[in-house]
Amino acid sequence: MVKIKICGITRLSDALDACFAGADALGFNFSSKSPRAIAPERAKEIIEKLPPFVESTGIFVDQSPEEINALCQYCRLQIAQLHSEQYSPEQARSITAAKVIKVFRPEENFAVEEVFAFAQNSGINAFLFDAYRPGMAGGTGETIEASLATRIFNELGNSCYAILAGGLNATNVGEAIRRIQPYGVDTASGVESRPGIKDSREIRSFVKAVHHGGH
């Protein structure tokens, strides 16, 4: 079954709505430039109240590996998502407080050899692919061009855990799953009423669409 991450959580009520709807993971954005940014203290409070079997993910754009390790320990994050091109394989390997997901924002000429090289040099086996938009690290609401996403995921095969993000919502996620067959899907803006504020009905609709699309 395709895994589901609801990203950009800023409120406990939204976190619990996502959990009870069937999300497998929640994302907390620690980039101060994001409209979905959350303070570590608030993230910790929310994570402490989550039910078991739901993983908490920290989204990091400009923190050092040392800062990431400290935040993962403080907030009890299970996953560190490196949402920036600045992180090298060596830096990723030095993050030991949580499992690491490396994000790529592919353009038309993207070569999957970049993924293979990063995996080999870092030991990471989970990668997320988000839509590319100059000057923005994610949460744009834009989708990856369909043929590009299909090519990348086909070429990756079963070499890693590949997660699809970028403009996914209840309307388009089912078709994306059938076409691309990702390990998991990730959405933020696709289940919001405004940045950082989730819509419980949209969350339920998204989860339902994922489950239907995966069959």
Swiss-Prot record:
<keyword id="KW-0413">Isomerase</keyword>
<dbReference type="GO" id="GO:0004640">
    <property type="term" value="F:phosphoribosylanthranilate isomerase activity"/>
</dbReference>
<protein>
    <recommendedName>
        <fullName>N-(5'-phosphoribosyl)anthranilate isomerase</fullName>
        <ecNumber>5.3.1.24</ecNumber>
    </recommendedName>
</protein>
<keyword id="KW-0028">Amino-acid biosynthesis</keyword>
<comment type="similarity">
    <text>Belongs to the TrpF family.</text>
</comment>
<dbReference type="GO" id="GO:0000162">
    <property type="term" value="P:L-tryptophan biosynthetic process"/>
</dbReference>
<keyword id="KW-0822">Tryptophan biosynthesis</keyword>
<dbReference type="InterPro" id="IPR011060">
    <property type="entry name" value="RibuloseP-bd_barrel"/>
</dbReference>
<dbReference type="InterPro" id="IPR001240">
    <property type="entry name" value="PRAI_dom"/>
</dbReference>
<dbReference type="Pfam" id="PF00697">
    <property type="entry name" value="PRAI"/>
</dbReference>
<dbReference type="InterPro" id="IPR044643">
    <property type="entry name" value="TrpF_fam"/>
</dbReference>
<dbReference type="InterPro" id="IPR013785">
    <property type="entry name" value="Aldolase_TIM"/>
</dbReference>
<comment type="pathway">
    <text>Amino-acid biosynthesis; L-tryptophan biosynthesis; L-tryptophan from chorismate: step 3/5.</text>
</comment>
<keyword id="KW-0057">Aromatic amino acid biosynthesis</keyword>
